[in-house]
Amino acid sequence: MNIFEQTICDWTAKVLNNIDDSRTWDTSSFNELVEKPPNPDMGDYALPCFSFAKSLRRPPFQIAVELAEQLQSYISPETPLISIQAKDSYLNFTVSAAVMAEVVLPDVFCGKYFTEPSNISRERVMIEFSQPNTHKGFHVGHMRNVALGDSLCRIFCYNGYDVVGANYIGDVGAHIAKCLWFYSNYNTETPPEKFRGEWLGELYTHAVKKLDEAEGQEKIKFQKEISQIQQKLEAKDEQFIQEWEKTREWSLLDFQEIYEWLDVSFDHIFYESEVDEEGRQIVIEGEKKGIFQYSEGAIGIDLEEEELGFFMLLKSDGNTLYSTKDLALAQHKFDQFGVKRSIYVVGAEQTLHFKQVFATLKRMGYEQVDKCFHLPYALVILSEGKMSSRAGNVILFSQLRKEIIESIQSNHLGEHRQEWSKKELEETAQKIAVAAIKYGMLNQDSNKQIVFSMDDWLVSEGDTGTYLVYAYVRIRSICRQISREVVADVDFSLLAHPNEKKLLRQMLDFNRTVFKSGEQYRPSLLARMLYEFSKDFSRAYNTCSVKHAETEMLQAARLLLFHCVAETLLQGLHLIGISPPERM
């Protein structure tokens, strides 16, 4: 809560206690009620009066008028609030721009504003995200999960949580048996030098196609061969384990290169192969204890009481399922890492699965399950429809990277080819590319489907990551053009233009927005705030010139303002996983 919100709550509590003796009104009664008006012309803050109606026994709009009249007496030249008005059932408060600037700019300038939230000690949180499968290509559809999880890790860390970013790589399963079956029996190609994991994904697609097209005895033969490979892998047959380890490493090297390019890291990586047998033993022991039951030779748990049906945990042939391994994985998270909150960033199609997993963990006695949360997200599709590794209609990472870098170097950096070094051109193109991809994956709520369009996402105007980094670079360029040093000791009262005040208000709201983005699992809130912030800067740039300011004092004040806008934008971009270049 900032000084203005605190003042609103303190004054309102005093007035309510004067007019209502039926209870004691405390500041904490409505510190969560203070909000931002839908229209900035209405004021800087709003307080709805609906929750006061029951106690005061009169309509909210009447309460708003009465409170506004009494609150006027608190306003003076020394107070941060300069206007209080009743509008319908709301109280609208206007803040002094000079006081707002004096409060926020020095703290942003010295960096204190961005360190205060992380001083709050909160619980340990594990955020599990990405979860790619080896022996399959990493494609553009995987980027949404990566962008969501990485941003949440950064946001939770900023908000003071002890964050463990985790990956859970699918390195066992039927898809691997199919891939190795085709690789061993039908492949005639030499593995490429780079992105061999993607190449394995192509073999997997060929395997699926060959299996789907087979009929009769041939299909039975193929299925039997694949089943035998699966059994040999589970039995740790030396020949197939060596093939599995070699090809698995190809995929892991692909993933490592992709994460480095995207500037994404993990504190811990789990592998399905590591929890496979452990999950089996958990289920067997659970059956002995009466937690789980046999059903037609398989083992599962009856979740009818939770209206979640029968949840199978172990197949009748003894083979494990995703559910088997998820129980072992959760146990590791709780026992080995001591997490108090566990977040799973996984596609919306797994919603029922996670409801069943969490219900099963609760039956097993894990109280932490109440703080387990599945963050579902909708698909990323192409303009022609849904992507599928099985069908092979995906944009693979290597193709995406090549095409997006070529487009950026041609359309955005072409004029710098003669003057910039090759290294700077490549690094700048990579930063713009990552900004375009990550912002495109984050600027909508996770339940909204995304249509991927590289051309649209690379436009330097409008709601794109490219626009955001352009705004940042532009601000830095403006500040470099001014020969004077940026200082915090300025006349804050000179920052009186409405467009300057909008920027101040956005900076003042920054930490609140970041906190809400974490608690609501919605990085989209921060992404959209950064877009609005960048638009507000463009308006201020056109109306509040730094270079052509009327006086040196005004130039110093605006230079500080624009410098702080750049610092806030930089911090916000970092929290959604974007590192902007310093020039473009």
What are these model-derived regions, one by one?
Residues 105-106:
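Beta-lactamase-like hydrolase cores
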